[in-house]
């Protein structure tokens, strides 16, 4: 993207294996969190943008697969991180090269390293948090304590990880889950800024073996002091304008997709949101992808195929 910005792709995988090799292996799990972290190097502001996991996008050819239209979360299944980055760059007109990927175990350790997080949860979130706690405990082989009540709560690592997985509470589905993920990242960031350099360095060292990243360890350690200079300015989800009530798209064998309305206009909006560019014109490739997706939408928009 533009000069003066550094963009990272943050990925959370639902891979059930805690080993790094398994996380980075093609076909091991989906990426249930896809978040662009954009750092403005001049103003020291950070913006977070979740790409909704069910968004229909073009996954460019890689690893023996041809170009294919899939949900964003599924790109990882085709060729791991590389396919996910290629998809984001192609469809959103970005040039991200660096990524950080975590699994459940890594997120648990990160939250515990900053001393847990405090936030408000609803009654429905409480119910689902405790449901997901059981599953997260099984996946990671960790013990846990259920969260006793709604309202203002203190969550430890495994509880916060379960919170990030909730998608059925309060009728918000994946949009709500993406928002919860960004909320936890924001809280981790704020807690990290309150630590001293030594504490923060120790915390990061403690999670590195559960993180897959393109950034060399020495560079990560070197970047730690600058954490204190940055602030979280804003966060949102992509696509901004969307339609997520279609049951199926038989042409590409997809159920319950999210359509960007349209991809082209959403990409223009994204570049305004992240980089302050007015009237951004997406590439001709994005316009073609956008037109194809719009045609799929038009063809499959009929009463029996729409959730009421």
Residue ranges and their predicted role:
Residues 1-308:
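Non-catalytic, solvent-exposed segments at the cell envelope interface
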């Amino acid at each position: 993207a533009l000069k003066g910005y550094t963009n990272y792709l943050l990925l959370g995988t639902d891979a059930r294996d805690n080993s790094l090799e398994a996380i980075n292996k093609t076909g091991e799990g989906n990426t249930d969190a896809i978040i662009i972290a954009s750092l403005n190097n001049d103003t020291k502001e950070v913006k977070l943008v979740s790409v909704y996991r069910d968004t229909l996008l073009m996954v460019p050819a890689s690893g023996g697969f041809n170009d294919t239209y899939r949900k964003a979360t599924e790109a990882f299944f085709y060729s791991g991180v590389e396919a996910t980055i290629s998809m984001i760059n192609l469809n959103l007109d970005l040039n991200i090269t660096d990524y950080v990927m975590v699994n459940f175990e890594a997120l648990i350790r990160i939250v515990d390293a900053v001393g847990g997080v405090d936030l408000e949860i609803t009654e429905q979130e409480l119910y689902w948090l405790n449901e997901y706690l059981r599953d997260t405990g099984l996946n990671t082989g960790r013990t846990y304590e259920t969260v006793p009540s709604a309202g203002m709560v203190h969550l430890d690592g495994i509880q916060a990880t379960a919170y990030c997985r909730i998608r059925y509470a309060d009728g918000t589905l994946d949009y709500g889950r993406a928002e919860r993920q960004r909320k936890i990242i924001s809280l981790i960031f704020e807690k990290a800024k309150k630590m001293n350099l030594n504490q923060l360095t120790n915390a990061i060292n403690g999670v590195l073996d559960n993180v897959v990243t393109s950034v060399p360890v020495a560079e990560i350690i070197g970047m730690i002091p600058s954490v204190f200079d940055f602030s979280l300015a804003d966060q949102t989800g992509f696509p901004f304008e969307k339609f997520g009530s279609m049951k199926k798209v038989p042409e590409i064998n997809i159920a319950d997709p999210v359509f960007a309305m349209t991809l082209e206009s959403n990409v223009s909006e994204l570049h305004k949101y992240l980089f302050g560019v007015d009237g951004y014109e997406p590439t001709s490739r994005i316009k073609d992808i956008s037109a194809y997706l719009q045609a799929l939408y038009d063809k499959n928009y009929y009463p029996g195929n729409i959730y009421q």
